[in-house]
């Protein structure tokens, strides 16, 4: 599979194989990016129709990667409304709208294009504006957080979304260094605020940039909404696939899939179920999938990726 110059799709082969039993005809790519996953799916499943969603205008500007691709500029936190509108097409008013999608795919996080474009402000390795907005039309940018928010709020973001143990120390340094003029300045302030032993490990700004980016884009809130919508609108026998890149996202996906897979809670000596609980999901693979060494040799950025899948068993 050729690499996409905009964004190299992670575990595209695994995604295709997990969807072969479904033979999807209608699928949502909730994180279109440059269309890497969509391209692989269109090649694998002739006749497939894809609803391709992305909030980044740069991604939408790439255009559809093939026939049958319907582009929607939106955050996947709005997926419930988007799916309802599509599933209701051709259905009379007042009629119950059944789930109509065969699969949903989420590739969570920042794209290669966003990291490599210094003007987007996502990378601590490149000098650019302190921005980090995936949707450039959004009001909140990273500059507001680092240059206007109080210490306590910044520290909360770094701890909550970056799991940064030195959150308060770093937050105080950021406030003291104001105005933070660009991403290189922010990365330098963070590096200088931590002990030398910490600097000798991974770059100390890594978790800080992750945390601020998640806060700016409300990534976890959007994931929660998008995941619920996907489970609601995928048909029985259809699948929901999620590729995540850090523990916060993965824990959310793991817990939701586990909760959906829980069935009857009655004591084992009950002759019949009285709780009425029925599992809505099951996992067709025992363990989450990770990139192969061959893929990592071509795309080292995929190293932290985790792919989970759940299949709908009931409405």
Task: Report the location of each language-model feature.
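S-adenosyl-L-methionine-dependent methyltransferase catalytic core, i.e., the SAM/SAH-binding region
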Residues: 1-315
């Amino acid at each position: 599979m050729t690499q996409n110059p905009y964004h190299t799709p992670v575990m595209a082969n695994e995604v295709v194989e997990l969807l072969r039993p479904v033979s999807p005809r209608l699928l949502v790519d909730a994180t279109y990016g440059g269309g890497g996953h969509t391209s692989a799916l269109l090649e694998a499943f002739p006749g497939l129709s894809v609803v391709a969603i992305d909030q980044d205008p740069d991604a939408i500007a790439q255009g559809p990667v093939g026939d049958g691709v319907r582009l929607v500029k939106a955050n996947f936190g709005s997926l419930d409304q988007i799916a309802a509108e599509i599933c209701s097409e051709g259905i009379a008013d007042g009629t119950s709208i059944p789930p109509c999608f065969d699969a949903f795919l989420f590739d969570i996080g920042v794209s290669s294009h966003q990291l490599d474009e210094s003007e987007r402000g996502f990378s601590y390795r490149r000098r650019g504006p302190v921005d980090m907005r995936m949707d450039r039309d959004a009001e909140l940018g990273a500059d507001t957080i680092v240059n206007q928010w109080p210490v306590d709020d910044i520290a909360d973001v770094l701890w909550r979304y970056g799991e940064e143990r030195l959150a308060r120390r770093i937050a105080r340094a950021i406030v003291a260094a104001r105005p933070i003029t660009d991403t290189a300045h922010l990365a330098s302030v963070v590096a200088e605020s931590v002990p030398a032993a910490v600097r000798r490990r991974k770059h100390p700004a890594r978790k800080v940039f992750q945390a601020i980016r998640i806060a700016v884009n409300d990534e976890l809130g959007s994931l929660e909404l998008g995941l619920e919508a996907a489970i609601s609108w995928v048909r029985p026998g259809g699948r929901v696939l999620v590729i995540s890149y850090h523990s916060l996202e993965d824990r959310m996906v793991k817990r939701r899939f586990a909760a959906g897979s829980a069935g009857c809670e009655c004591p084992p000596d009950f002759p019949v179920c009285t709780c009425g609980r029925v599992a809505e999901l099951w996992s067709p693979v025992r363990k989450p999938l990770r990139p192969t060494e061959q893929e990592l040799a071509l795309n080292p950025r995929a190293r932290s990726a985790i792919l989970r899948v759940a299949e709908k068993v009931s409405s």
